[in-house]
Each structure stands twice: as C-alpha cells, then as structure tokens.
Amino acid sequence: KGSQQTADKVNHYFREIETPTKQLTPFEGIRAMKDLKLLSAWLQMTKLGQYTRIYNALLGLIKLDLKTCSVKDLESVHGIGPKTARFIIMHSRPNQRLATLDTHILRWMRDQGIDTPKATPQSQKLYKELEDKFLTLCDESAILPSQLDLKIWKQYSK
C-alpha cells in the first residue's frame, strides 16, 4: 500500500510537470522531486538499478545550470562521462557542436568508411578525433549534430 501511494505521488507530480503552465527543465524537475522527497521513489520505479550511484549523480547534476553548464562542468559530476555530458548539452541546446559517440553513431561512422571502435572510446584524445570527424560529416551534410544524432538513432536502434 505504501509503495502504491508513493507511485501515485510520483505519477501525479509528473502530470503536474507536463502541464503547459509549468515549463521545468529536466534539472528543475529533478530538483523539485528531491525537494518533495520523491527522487528516490522515482528512481526505484524506473527499475534502472544502481539507485545510489544514479541518485548521487543526479544530486551533482542539479547543482548545475542546464542552460549554461559546459561539458567539463558535467564531466566533473561523478558518473558522468564524455558521452553523457555531450548528450545532455546537445539535446538541451540543439545548436551545440558536439557528438554523442554511442554504439549507433560509431556504427554509422564505420558505414561511412571511418575506422571506429565498437564502444564509446575511453581515451579523450580518440573521442575528440572521432567527434571532429562526426562534426565534419555534419557540416558536409549541412545538418546540426543533434539532428543527425537523432536521425542515426532512429535508423540504427531498430
């Protein structure tokens, strides 16, 4: 019964966030859930696992301003690496020139004749080299990185 009440509170809260009168950024939504003591319950409902690690990462994220934070700011949060930092910025500020080098992007780049690893590179140097190649492909196609990322994801995630 208690977990159902918590689930009902979390679901009610999200319905409130989605109303046109409340335009919260994702970070503001996470901040509000923390303030309402619903963040842990929401994480449990997602069934993602690793709740403590994710909870602590979210606490680090909500200290930042999503509209102005840099990749470096995001990477300073324990648990946030280059791919996630770029994903957050690229999809919250679509005009950013960044690449989220996930398996779909890397596979697409291989299909374009570029030698890439199968998994996101852990080396900052290699990540930057591949990001630059991806951005060049965006320029050649006259498409924003966020738009190409979404297009590739739709095509390769099937």
For each of these PLM feature ranges, what is it?
Residues 1-8:
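A short secondary-structure junction motif
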Residues 11-78:
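Alpha-helical ds-nucleic-acid-binding substructure associated with the helix-hairpin-helix region
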Residues 50-62, 67-69, 76-158:
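C-terminal accessory module of base-excision DNA glycosylases/AP lyases that mediates lesion recognition
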